[in-house]
Amino acid sequence: MVLLSALLAREVAGDRAGLITAFIGAIYPFLWVNDGLIMSESFTGVAVVGTVLATYKAARSPNQWWRWLLVGLLGGISALGRAELVLLVPVIAAGVLLAPRIGAIRVRLIASALAGVALLLVLAPWFIYNSSRFEKRVILSTNDGLAMVASNCDEAYSGNVIGLTFLRSADCLPAPPRGDQSVVAEEYRRVAFKYMSENASRVPIVVLARLGRDWSLFRPADMLSWNVAEGRPRWVTSLGLVFYYPLLLGAFVGAFILWRRKRWIWPLLAPGLVVSLGAIFAYGQIRFRAPAEPFIVILCAIALSAIGRQGASNRNEDPLTQ
């Protein structure tokens, strides 16, 4: 992931940004902590960075149609790791359609369509397989029902634990109905939506709490003990948060610099948008923002690179240094 992140930063902002990204990425705990957990985050992180890198490469040569197929292919691989990442290619495609710099509208339409077709081709075998083994329709996973029902209950809607999930609570996790996991997921979704409709006034507050937890902007200390239960040592989460806040601030600066330079920034922001959408419909957890972590590092590195370059330029222009 570090290598791909460095290559992406180099593609967007030059060699200096790539080197800074490689250095920060090698020591940033939230980039390497998931590797030892044998969970999907490490795999999907690589695939997401690869998808965005392929997007920038394709945008440089928009008439090389195979490049857009590669974008969809890598996006499909990302979605097989985490279901919410099925939104990544559509979100990127929306940015392509709205970016005149890529080419004429015809080129952008074809590019977006090719990426979408490739995404569907990657997901089709899994969808067909699921259609043959479950009673109800399952596109990617049956986990959505479980995540929704355990995150839409009294415990998750109030108090100090608002915005989290409760898989071990009998009040939050009702007895499953008869049938396979697709039947269970369908029933859990029904229960979750019913609870949401009955508590509609609380939903906006809960959504804000979920987003705040996802981005460590609301009660971040809660994740110290929460992450221990998932196999992350307490000290790693603490160290990760020490790194995270300066990097996040730097990422905002980097995004602003790219915007001022009229560079195409949308693909770098797309993973963060998808991560946020996932939190809105599930619950907030540091691990869920793993696909967006490399882009925080990249944008911060771009800011540091620009500041360093500006400083060097000022020294060269200072007559006292001549």
Segments from the language model and where they lie:
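Membrane-interface transmembrane helices that cradle and orient dolichyl/undecaprenyl
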Residues: 16, 51-70, 96-103, 304-307
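Short acidic/glycine- and proline-prone juxtamembrane loop motifs at membrane-interface regions
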Residues: 30, 36-44
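Transmembrane-helix signature of polytopic, membrane-embedded enzymes
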Residues: 2-27, 46, 60-66, 70, ...
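Membrane-interface anchor segments at the N-terminal boundary of transmembrane helices
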Residues: 195, 203-268
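Transmembrane-helix motifs of polytopic, lipid-linked glycan transferases
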Residues: 1-13, 50-54, 249-253
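Membrane-interface helix-loop-helix junctions at transmembrane boundaries of multi-pass membrane enzymes
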Residues: 61-66, 100-114, 233-236, 252-270
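Short helix- or helix-capping micro-motifs
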Residues: 18-29, 33, 53, 75-79
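Membrane-proximal stem/loop segments at transmembrane-domain junctions that anchor or position
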Residues: 137-220
